[in-house]
């Protein structure tokens, strides 16, 4: 009978297989792992930068208000100091932008979208200091701007900086870290990690490349930036409006009407922003002196309003809980809404370094509160609470303007910790977005990016013509 004998090649084959596995592991592309590690670095740096920016703005605002205390006995002097303090801070921000990094002006979010499409440069070595300190000047001066624009652009530029410092190669790494930094910036600005993720996936959906690595990187970056924020600011809702009552099912149709109102107003607001940009550009004509002086005048006006009518100035985070609590009359709400529409248009359209998320959240809250007060009077049988309409309206203008309803809904839920209102918020946001799309017009950031690219193309064409003319001569 034939017996099986152990093969002498078996141990050799096993060793050969082990060597091949080790060789394959060593030769495997480490880029995905490196990207994920760098995403954690980007998120950490963005979170620290956002905290520093937030603390810097708060410190400047406190110093500015403290300077007014010393002139409280002399009203004319008080108004003069209020104007000058804000004007000087604003002029500082405008000057930095115009002189050293024009792409740091405005929100900065369209710049990141353009960079993701390979249509706008990312010069982090000059944008980072200009956006940071310029934003400190404009927001610290009390202008009607949000901090999310600076933190998103700072975040995207930090992503590119990390890419360059660690010399990662490839389009995937560049694109992923840029998007990761932007998402981390929004998350740290509002203590809203899920909104930061949705912002990239929804608002930047035409530019964002959906790959397994990019999604993981965005998650990691957002987690790290939020951890950094909460280490210094604790785990609390950014806006404390208390726990509001849920909306009964038989009242949900009212939230659809509210969404329709925002769906009409959103595209109109976008047109006003673009029209104000054209108007203010005609005022300064590209001249740096005129532009800085114009910015100083707008900043000084916001400083005066911050003293005379505080609800009409600043980003709006202090206004939201007061309006939601029903502490304003209908007439006062109308005044605040009209005044803040004007100041928002002036500040944002002038090219000041600052965002428009926070001002739009405040406008949505005021309009939602006014609608809620009317509904309470017209339908007493429903036992309505005006504050629920304020929360629903907070993200509706954002949804109608930038066409990102999910981002607006989740952002407000994370900021206010009122998750029981998710259904009326979905109805309001969906109604606003659908009607805004039906009425036409581009989302705000897309329209601003299109203008920037058209201007860039015109400048490149002018330079090429000038170069051709010089060669011919």
UniProtKB/Swiss-Prot annotation:
The intramembrane stretches fall at 109-116, 177-189, 193-201, 387-401, 402-404, 405-416, 417-421
- Annotated membrane-spanning segments are 33-69, 77-100, 124-141, 148-166, 215-232, 253-281, 288-309, 330-349, 355-376, 422-438
Give the bilayer topology: Multi-pass membrane protein
* Keywords noted in UniProt: Antiport, Cell inner membrane, Cell membrane, Chloride, Ion transport, Membrane, Transmembrane, Transmembrane helix, Transport
- Topological domains on the Cytoplasmic side lie at 1-32, 117-123, 167-176, 202-214, 282-287, 439-473
Q: What is its main location?
A: membrane
| Reaction(s) catalysed (UniProt annotation) | 2 chloride(in) + H(+)(out) = 2 chloride(out) + H(+)(in)
User: Site described as Mediates proton transfer from the protein to the inner aqueous phase, positions?
Assistant: 203
* Cellular component terms (Gene Ontology): plasma membrane
**Subcellular localization, as worded in the UniProt entry:** Cell inner membrane
Pfam families membership: Voltage_CLC
Q: Name one GO molecular function term.
A: antiporter activity
Disulphide bonds in the chain: none
Q: Where is this site: Mediates proton transfer from the outer aqueous phase to the interior of the protein?
A: 148
Q: Where does chloride bind?
A: 107, 356-357, 445
Q: What job does this protein perform?
A: Proton-coupled chloride transporter. Functions as antiport system and exchanges two chloride ions for 1 proton. Probably acts as an electrical shunt for an outwardly-directed proton pump that is linked to amino acid decarboxylation, as part of the extreme acid resistance (XAR) response.
Kindly provide the name given to this protein in its UniProt entry.
H(+)/Cl(-) exchange transporter ClcA
Q: Which organism is it from?
A: Escherichia coli O157:H7
């Amino acid at each position: 009978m034939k017996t099986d004998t152990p093969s002498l090649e078996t141990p050799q084959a096993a060793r050969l297989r082990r060597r091949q596995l080790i060789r394959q592991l060593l030769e495997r592309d480490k880029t995905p792992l490196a990207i994920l590690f760098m995403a954690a670095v980007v998120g950490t740096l963005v979170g620290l930068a956002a905290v520093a920016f937030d603390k810097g703005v708060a410190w400047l605002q406190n110093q500015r208000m403290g300077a007014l205390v010393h002139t409280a006995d002399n009203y004319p002097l008080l108004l003069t100091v209020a104007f000058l303090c804000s004007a000087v801070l604003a002029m500082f921000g405008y000057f930095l932008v115009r002189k050293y990094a024009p792409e740091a002006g405005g929100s900065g979010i369209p710049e990141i979208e353009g960079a993701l499409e390979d249509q706008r440069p990312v010069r982090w070595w000059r944008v980072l200091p200009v956006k940071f300190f310029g934003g400190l000047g404009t927001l610290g001066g009390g202008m009607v701007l949000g901090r999310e624009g600076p933190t998103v652009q700072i975040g995207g530029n930090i992503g590119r900086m990390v890419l360059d410092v660690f010399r990662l190669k490839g389009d995937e790494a560049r694109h992923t870290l840029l998007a990761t930094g932007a998402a981390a910036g929004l998350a740290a600005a509002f203590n809203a990690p899920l909104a930061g993720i949705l912002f990239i996936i929804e608002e930047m959906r035409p530019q964002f490349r959906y790959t397994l690595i990019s999604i993981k990187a965005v998650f990691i970056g957002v987690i790290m930036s939020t951890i950094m924020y909460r280490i210094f600011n604790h785990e609390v809702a950014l806006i404390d409006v208390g726990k509001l009552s849920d909306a009964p099912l038989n009242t949900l149709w009212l939230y659809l009407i509210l969404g329709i109102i925002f769906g009409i107003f959103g595209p109109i607001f976008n047109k006003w922003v673009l029209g104000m940009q054209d108007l203010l550009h005609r005022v300064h004509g590209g001249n740096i002196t005129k532009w800085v002086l114009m910015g100083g005048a707008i900043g000084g006006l916001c400083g005066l309003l911050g003293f005379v009518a505080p609800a009409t100035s600043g980003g709006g985070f202090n206004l939201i809980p007061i309006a939601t609590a029903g502490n304003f009359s209908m007439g006062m709400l109308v005044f605040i809404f009209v005044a803040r529409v004007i100041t928002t248009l002036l500040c944002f359209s002038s090219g000041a370094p600052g965002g428009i998320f926070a001002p739009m959240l405040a406008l949505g809250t005021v309009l939602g509160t006014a609608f809620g007060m009317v509904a309470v009077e017209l339908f007493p049988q429903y036992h309505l609470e005006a504050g629920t309409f304020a929360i629903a309206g907070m993200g509706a203008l954002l949804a109608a303007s930038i066409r990102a309803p999910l981002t607006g809904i989740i952002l407000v839920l994370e900021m206010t910790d009122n998750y029981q209102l998710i259904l009326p918020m979905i109805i309001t946001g969906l109604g606003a977005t659908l009607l805004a799309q039906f009425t036409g017009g581009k989302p705000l950031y897309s329209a601003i990016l299109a203008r920037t690219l058209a201007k860039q193309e015109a400048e490149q064409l002018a330079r090429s013509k000038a170069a051709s003319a010089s060669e011919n001569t």
